[in-house]
Amino acid sequence: MSDTARILGGPSASSSRDGGMELNSFTEVSQTNSRSHSTKEEEGQVDDQQRPAREEETGVLGGYKLVLVTIGLCFCIFCTSLDNTIVATAVPRITQQFHSLDDVGWYASAYLLTTCAVTLTFGRLYTFFPIKWVYLSALLIFELGSFICGITPSSLGLILGRAVAGLGGGGLLSGSLLIISQCVPSARRPAFSGFIMSIFAVASVIAPLMGGAFTDHVSWRWCFYINLPFGLVSAVVILFTFQHTKPVIQASLREKAVGLDPLGTATFLPGIVCLLLATQWGGAQYPWGDGRVVALFVLFGVLLVCFIGLQLWARERATVPPRLLRGRNIWGSALYGFCLNGAMFTFVYYLPIWFQAVQGASATESGIRNLPLVISNVVFAIISGVLVSMTGYLGPFMLLSAAMASISAGLLSTLQPSSGAGEWIGYQVLLGLSIGVGFQVPIFVVQTTLASTDIPTATALMTFIQLLGGAIFVSVAQNMFRNQLATDIRTVLPMLDPTAVINAGPTSLRGMYSGETLTTLVALYNDAVVHTFYLAIGLAAASFLAATVIQWRPLAKAVGE
């Protein structure tokens, strides 16, 4: 029997000497068992003995080793999440040094494009190769990209460095969640995964504050140098304390190459790049009807159809095995995470703009005013993780999170130039509560309800969908903001050039204008920012609808077992 044929299913199931499952037997067994499990799951008939979380758990850590691994993973997640937004407040200084105003969009998108593009590929790498070494390789690539960004003498070098860092970053969030799932029993995973995901959310919020502080007081290059010591600590900790070196599936190199789904990857990677470029360029750099934007959307559609067809044909060898999406808990969680993450990042990007433009805060002050969101997010992420572990239920937390997100988004959309601290502090606390309670739950779903052989791919899938939701809807919000502000300026202040006002940035308003003109511009900025919050309201409401399909059934494994 050829290697490729064996991948499609062997005659019997067997385990390797190292404890990993053979690829040829895995495919046949997973297809049969997962089909049976999915059917029963949809009917709500899966009992505790049948659930995959009853599998024997190995590699569990305790004591100081678990503490060290958790700290190391948090350092790594902190850095990779910082890179999503830290460059925003450093852009003016970077463009001034490199004389590269036309490259501004690439400073953020280069990292985002490569991160989203390779996340699913890392899911397959984590399936066929030891998690430890794949993770350390991704961390090395991320650190290399950060180093290039720090030392680069040109704008092109910065863009290339950001792209390289994104290649590594695409494997670090899902890898961190996989490592922690290997280190703790399934009953405790929600608590630990919740804490790690809270670090991701917190870093996304405070990144602009750190970027502004580095730019103002040291150098913008420290936005990237900061990753080096944190990454080194993470690498040392994982290298010496995490000893799980067995791949999920044992296979020959040729079988691994086929199992990595090269055809699917060849259509997926350029397809995602086309989608993200189209959403970032459309309405901002080029009109939506521009031939380049239309061509990108068309190419994305063609590549998406090809990718779906290849996934259906490849089945168990696919980047995303189709059976994973049959269970309503999985696709419901994916849709929920996509929408909730889009809402969250809309506020992460535009609340600081409201503080700076409407209330006259500096970049550093706006970061400080975001602390209610940061603190409440961390507190309730930890609390929700513990409560999920204690109660064993996921659905109620998703519904509560989405409902509170809808309410807090609605309240934030009522902000006015005259709004006091009590309003924006209270609304942010409520928003932090909603995000903290539910942001990480889609990861809980895949790590507590799927077989261990599916967890790497499913974790990468959920991570990718959440990142994609943030990337797409931030671009949509940006277009809504620019279009609304430009339209209002042309209508109310026709003597001003809307492009000049927008490009000057929110922190420059009070230095360029005064009197009645400034008062009017502040009101127009307020309206434009609030306009993006309407998008967040819709996304939060959509996440609530998605949460309603999640089954209210206790997790497979009770606490303490």
UniProtKB/Swiss-Prot annotation:
Q: Membrane topology for this entry? A: Multi-pass membrane protein
Q: Where is this region: Disordered?
A: 1-55
> Sorted alphabetically, which Gene3D superfamilies does this protein's record hold?
MFS general substrate transporter like domains, Multidrug resistance protein D
**Record's compositionally biased regions (Basic and acidic residues):** 38-55
Give this protein's Gene Ontology molecular function annotations. transmembrane transporter activity
Q: Which UniProt keywords apply?
A: Cell membrane, Membrane, Transmembrane, Transmembrane helix
Q: Which GO terms describe its cellular component?
A: plasma membrane
Q: Which CDD domains match?
A: MFS_Azr1_MDR_like
Look up keyword Transmembrane helix and say if it applies.
yes
Which stretches are transmembrane? 59-79, 103-123, 128-148, 164-184, 194-214, 222-242, 257-277, 293-313, 335-355, 378-398, 425-445, 457-477, 530-550
Q: Write out the annotated subcellular location.
A: Cell membrane
Q: Where is the composition biased (Polar residues)?
A: 24-36
Q: Name one Pfam family in it.
A: MFS_1
Record's superkingdom?
Eukaryota
Family of the protein in this entry: Belongs to the major facilitator superfamily. TCR/Tet family.
Q: What is the recorded function of this protein according to its Swiss-Prot or TrEMBL entry?
A: Efflux pump; part of the gene cluster that mediates the biosynthesis of bifonsecin B, a dimeric gamma-naphthopyrone.
**Name the record gives this protein:** Efflux pump bfoC
